[in-house]
C-alpha cells in the first residue's frame, strides 16, 4: 500500500477553492477533488460546500453517497491522511456556551455565541422538508441541557390550578397531531436592508426560513384539559416561557392571542417531533411551541411554562423587539410602545439558484426558489424576471395542497428558460398570496432600524 503524507485539519481547511486546490476529508483520509468539482453530478456548488472540511455531513443528505462505486471513485483522489493526533478541543468549563450541541458544517454562521445560522442557499430549496441538521437556527441564549426523565411542562390553569406534565404524559394523554409548517425569522433577508442603511441585528441572507413536519400535542387540547374555556371576551394572550435564560435568570418569552391558541384551525402545537424524530437540541428538545403562519419568535423553544394573561407577554422579546417601524424612525426617536408585536408575516420569496455572480452555460437555465406567506395564506403565483423587472414569466409552483386559510408551508418554485451566450441576467422574483398581497419592489420604502420584515422583490 502506498504511504501518504499526514495533514492536520487546519491544513486541509486552507484548501477551499480551485485556486488553492479543493481538499476534503472522509474518515481519516484526505482527498484533492479539484479536478472532480466540475464533474460532480449535483453541480460544482454542492461539492464546494464541503471544501476544506469533512464530506460526511453533506453526504448524509443524499443516500446515493453510500453506494460502493461512489467510495471507489473518491479513492482516486486520495492525497493524504489526517494526522493521528488530531482530536477535538476540550470544552471550556467557564464558557456558558460550552454545552451547546455540535452543528452541521454546511450552515452559514451569523453568530457563534449564541449560535445563529442558516442553510446555504444552494441547498435551501432542494427539498420540500428541510433536513433537521440544516434547519435554520435562531438562539438568543445558551442551549439548555434538559434531562427527558425529569422534564416537566407547567400549565398555569384558571383559579390558581396548575397542570404539570412530563414528556411521557404529554405524549400519552393527548392525541398526536402533525402539521407541516414553515418557520421564518423576522430578520430573514436583513442583509439586504443593511445595504440601504445600517440596521441592528444579525446579517441574515435568504436562509432564515425552513420547513418541517412537526408532531406533538395540540395547544388547544392542553389548554382545554387545564380548564380554560373555548373563548374569552377580552384581549387575553397565551404566554410561553422557555428554559433558556439570561444571566439574570429571565427566560426567553413570547405570546400569541388567546383566540389563535384555542382555534382548531390554527394548528398550534406543543411539538416533540420534527420530521419524524425527536426534536434536536438546537431545535428545542424536548418540547417547543410551533405557531404556524406566525413569526418564528413566537414559537418558543425548550418550553417550560404556559400561562394565560390579560396582556401580552412582558418578555423584552415581545415588548422591545420584533416590531416594525417607519423608515423615518431612528434610535433617538424609537418608542417600542407605539408598534404592535409582529405576529403574522407578509408574503415572501427568494431565488436560491443560481447564486449572484454565478456563470451559467448557454442553453437552458432552471431558476429555483421558495415562496411563503404568513397567516395560512397560500402562495398563488410567483413571477420571475430575467431583466430586472422589465418583463416577467410565471414560475411553476410545487408544494402541498392545504385547506383555505391553513397553507402553513412554503411553496418551492422553478422556471426553466433559454439563455444565450454572453447574456447578463438580472434575476428578480416576487410572490403573490391568496389575498393578492404582493411583495414591494424595493427595500428603501420598507427599511426599518431593526431590519425586520425584509420582503422586497428578491434580486
Swiss-Prot record:
Residues 85-100 have a biased composition (Low complexity). GO terms for molecular function: heme binding; molybdenum ion binding; molybdopterin cofactor binding; sulfite oxidase activity. SMART domains: Cyt-b5 (SM01117). Mo-molybdopterin binds at residues 136-140, 185, 244, 283, 288, 299-301. It is an enzyme of class 1 (oxidoreductase). One of its GO terms (biological process) is sulfur compound metabolic process. Residues 4-83 form the Cytochrome b5 heme-binding domain. It holds the Pfam family Cyt-b5. GO terms for cellular component: mitochondrial intermembrane space; mitochondrion. Keywords: Heme, Iron, Metal-binding, Mitochondrion, Molybdenum, Oxidoreductase. Its cofactor is heme b; Mo-molybdopterin. Residues 324-459 are annotated as: Homodimerization. Residues 96-323 are annotated as: Moco domain. Its EC number is 1.8.3.1. Binds 1 heme b (iron(II)-protoporphyrin IX) group non-covalently per subunit. Binds 1 Mo-molybdopterin (Mo-MPT) cofactor per subunit. Residues 83-115 are annotated as: Disordered. Heme b binds at residues 40, 65, 69. It is found in: Mitochondrion intermembrane space. Residues 86-95 are annotated as: Hinge. Pathway: Energy metabolism; sulfur metabolism. It comes from the Eukaryota. It catalyses: sulfite + O2 + H2O = sulfate + H2O2. Homodimer. Catalyzes the oxidation of sulfite to sulfate, the terminal reaction in the oxidative degradation of sulfur-containing amino acids. This is Sulfite oxidase. It comes from Gallus gallus (Chicken). The gene is SUOX.
Amino acid at each position: 500500500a502506498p504511504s501518504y503524507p499526514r495533514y492536520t485539519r487546519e491544513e486541509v481547511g486552507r484548501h477551499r477553492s480551485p485556486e488553492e486546490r479543493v481538499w476534503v476529508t472522509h474518515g481519516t483520509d484526505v482527498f484533492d477533488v479539484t479536478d472532480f468539482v466540475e464533474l460532480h453530478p449535483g453541480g460544482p456548488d454542492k461539492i464546494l460546500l464541503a471544501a476544506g472540511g469533512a464530506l460526511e455531513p453533506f453526504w448524509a443528505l443524499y443516500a446515493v453517497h453510500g453506494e460502493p462505486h461512489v467510495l471507489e471513485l473518491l479513492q482516486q483522489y486520495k492525497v493524504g491522511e489526517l494526522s493521528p493526533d488530531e482530536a477535538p478541543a476540550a470544552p471550556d468549563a467557564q464558557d456558558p456556551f460550552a454545552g451547546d450541541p455540535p452543528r452541521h458544517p454546511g450552515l452559514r454562521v451569523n453568530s457563534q455565541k449564541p449560535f445563529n445560522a442558516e442553510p446555504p442557499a444552494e441547498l435551501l430549496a432542494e427539498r420540500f422538508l428541510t433536513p433537521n441538521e440544516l434547519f435554520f437556527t435562531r438562539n438568543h441564549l445558551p442551549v439548555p441541557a434538559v434531562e427527558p426523565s425529569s422534564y416537566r411542562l407547567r400549565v398555569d390553569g384558571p383559579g390558581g390550578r396548575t397542570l404539570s406534565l412530563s414528556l411521557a404524559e404529554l405524549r400519552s394523554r393527548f392525541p398526536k397531531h402533525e402539521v407541516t409548517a414553515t418557520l421564518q425569522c423576522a430578520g430573514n433577508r436583513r442583509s439586504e436592508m443593511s445595504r440601504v442603511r445600517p440596521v441592528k441585528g444579525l446579517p441574515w441572507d435568504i436562509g432564515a426560513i425552513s420547513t418541517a413536519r412537526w408532531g406533538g400535542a395540540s395547544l388547544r387540547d392542553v389548554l382545554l384539559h387545564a380548564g380554560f374555556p373555548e373563548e374569552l371576551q377580552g384581549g387575553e394572550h397565551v404566554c410561553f416561557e422557555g428554559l433558556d435564560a439570561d444571566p439574570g435568570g429571565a427566560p426567553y418569552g413570547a405570546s400569541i392571542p388567546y383566540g389563535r391558541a384555542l382555534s382548531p384551525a390554527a394548528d398550534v402545537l406543543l411539538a416533540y417531533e420534527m420530521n419524524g424524530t425527536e426534536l434536536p437540541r438546537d431545535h428545542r428538545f424536548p418540547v417547543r411551541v410551533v405557531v404556524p403562519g406566525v413569526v418564528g419568535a413566537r414559537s418558543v423553544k425548550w418550553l417550560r411554562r404556559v400561562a394565560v394573561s390579560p396582556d401580552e407577554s412582558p418578555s423584552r422579546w415581545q415588548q422591545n423587539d420584533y416590531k416594525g417601524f417607519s423608515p423615518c424612525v431612528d434610535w433617538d426617536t424609537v418608542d417600542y410602545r407605539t408598534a404592535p408585536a409582529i405576529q403574522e408575516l407578509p408574503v415572501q420569496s427568494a431565488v436560491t439558484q443560481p447564486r449572484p455572480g454565478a456563470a451559467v452555460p448557454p442553453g437552458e437555465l432552471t431558476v429555483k426558489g421558495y415562496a411563503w406567506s404568513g397567516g395560512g395564506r397560500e402562495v398563488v403565483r410567483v413571477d420571475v424576471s430575467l431583466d430586472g423587472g422589465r418583463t416577467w414569466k410565471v414560475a411553476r409552483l410545487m408544494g402541498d395542497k392545504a385547506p383555505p386559510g391553513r397553507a402553513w408551508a412554503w411553496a418551492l418554485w422553478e422556471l426553466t428558460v433559454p439563455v444565450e451566450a454572453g447574456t447578463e441576467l438580472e434575476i428578480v422574483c416576487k410572490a403573490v398570496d391568496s389575498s393578492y398581497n404582493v411583495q414591494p419592489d424595493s427595500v428603501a420604502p420598507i427599511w426599518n432600524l431593526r431590519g425586520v420584515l425584509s420582503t422586497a422583490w428578491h434580486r
